[in-house]
């Protein structure tokens, strides 16, 4: 029996997320060519062997560690009520913002409440 050990890599998470910039936001969509915010974070993590729940509230509940914004590490999920994104460093994050927009990089993590960690 083949066993594969998955090692968390924030850099791999970020690169997977950045590979989807420009994909349209579609409410309820989970990829691979369109996303809503939590569908995006779920898809990115799944591509890296980490299975997290579908909605932003479930993603927060499933986190192994909830961290303050001052403790963020590259690859953490940024969380606020109703929205999630992936921290890419230097105060920036990649996310699927809202209807009419596309997956993109934005600045200003202070809009979020906390970071979520799954390892």
What are these regions (language model features)?
Residues 3, 8-10, 15, 50-69, ...:
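Aromatic- and glycine-rich peptidoglycan recognition patches
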Residues 12-54:
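Secreted/periplasmic proteins that engage bacterial cell-wall peptidoglycan
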């Amino acid at each position: 029996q083949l066993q594969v050990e998955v090692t968390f890599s924030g850099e791999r998470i970020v690169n997977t997320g950045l590979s989807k910039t420009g994909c349209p936001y579609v409410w309820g969509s989970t990829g691979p060519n369109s996303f809503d915010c939590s569908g995006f974070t779920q898809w990115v993590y799944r591509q890296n062997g980490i299975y997290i729940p579908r909605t932003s509230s479930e993603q927060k509940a499933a986190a192994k560690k909830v961290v303050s914004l001052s403790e963020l590490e590259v690859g953490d999920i940024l969380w606020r009520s109703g929205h999630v994104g992936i921290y890419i460093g230097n105060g920036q994050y990649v996310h699927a913002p809202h209807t009419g927009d596309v997956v993109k990089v934005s600045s200003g993590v202070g809009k979020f409440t906390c970071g979520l960690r799954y390892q």
